[in-house]
Amino acid sequence: MYDQKRLRFPSSPCDTKFCDLSARPKRFPIVPSERSDVLRALFITLSESRWLRAVAEHSAVGQKVSSRFVAGTQLDDILRVTQAANQAGLTVSVDNLGENVTNAEEARASVERYHLLLDEIAARKLNANISLKLTHMGLDVDAKLAREQVAGLVAKAASMSPRNFVRVDMEGSAYTQRTLDFVHELHRVSGNQGCVGAVIQSYMRRSENDVEKLLAEGIRIRLCKGAYKEPPEIALQKKSEVDANYIKLMKLLMKSGAYHGLATHDERIINEAKTFATREAIPRDAFEFQMLYGIRRDLQQSLVHEGWRVRVYIPFGTEWYPYLMRRLAERPANLWFVAKNIMRR
């Protein structure tokens, strides 16, 4: 098992136990499902606080806590972590953290970092692709600029040998339709097929219809649960409903014949996927499980040892606060690790 925090490979039982977020002291019991929805709403609200973000991102404690979930702030940091993950049998999707840039200069700087990433991935022969947000590429500033910038990255990925891949992340519901339209548009460009993909959130009520349209064109999908604050008329509010829809959509993806990513740390859902794959004679290399950097590393390695494909979503950069809050919203059990890091200050 590799230690994603400092690129060490822990060998002691203590290190291994520390990596397993399921190993909690009795005084920190697993959060009951009836309280998970409340905590989820709380962390989503906190993710939108500009004041808390400014305080957290400039505090020593905040930076220490974020190191569990974020590879570092520099390009060299993410490249070292990616190489370590590859050596542990994991593929990677790299995300340069950021969203909702406010000017064209920020947007151009963001896309330039992604061009450098693609160059370094190729030069170092890393098994990694890139994930990005359209608002980080300037969608709020100039939609045409954002489209041109991402189109350039997809064209570059498609021209590489071996070909690489660009995942366009999903953001809040205000961006859902524009994001999907853009992915469809990029996919239809000659030579881009298989080099650009979308993200579908199972808590969105519209997701089944979106999945059907994406599958009709053979567009690769990452399926996740969703971690933005949305009203009941747009998104499912109960965890049980979100999980049930995830499983329903997951089976559609697995039977489609295209290569998709199942992004979850939920062992019940993972076991359901494994059982379904066996029952339907779906090969283990026909899809991949996707997990977040710093979360359930024991499970990542267990799946790899069983012969399943696992991709780790590894972010880097200084704008980590919204990302961390959304990870706590998705999995309130991660709060134990945050508390432990603060106490170890």
What residues fall within each predicted segment?
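Positively charged, amphipathic and often flexible ligand-engagement surfaces
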Residues: 27-345
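Low-complexity, intrinsically disordered or signal/transmembrane-proximal segments
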Residues: 2-4
